[in-house]
Amino acid sequence: MTAHEMAKGILESVQSLKPKKERNLIAIAGPPGAGKSTLAEIVTDLMNENLMKTSLVPMDGFHLDNKTLKRANLLDRKGAPETFDVKGFTELIKNLRYKRNLSVPLFDRSVDEVVKNARKIPAEQEYIIAEGNYLLLNKDYWRDLYNYWDYKVFISVDKNILKSRLIERWLSENHTYSEAEARVLKNDLVN
């Protein structure tokens, strides 16, 4: 199934949600390299094309900064559940339920840091699509998110395909093949 076919199925399911005063929150989760970001962007575009006012909120905007990770000896594990500000993300999701103007942080991969207030979420938005690895994780503080989602999607992909995609991702960021493979095996696939 292609990302566009999946997106159309998600659109149809979301269109069947009962209307309510609060925003509908949709979670798209899965491992690194599964295609969450691509799928979330396609779904967001489709929903907006269908006059469903929708904004996208990536979980990656809640990476802890590199200094904090270094102090905690977690820099080599960046991307693991404990390397995110899960309490801050949960608070944002609580606030996104209500139709008011908000700003959300985004992760800038080119500088490996979070950019605060990088995306504006206008009050008139009716749907929020959140995407990230741990949105449906049943562990520690992450499990507190589960009941906020009105619709949930988990993308499952064969581990060999993930490995190949993740190595390509690191190669595109000017890492050697051995560096890329080491990062994928030591960190990305573990996450």
Q: For the regions a protein language model found, what residue spans apply to each?
A:
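Hydrophobic positions on the alpha1 helix immediately C-terminal to the Walker A/P-loop
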Residues: 39
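Small-molecule kinase domains that catalyze NTP-dependent phosphoryl transfer to phosphate-bearing small molecules
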Residues: 115-117, 143, 168-191
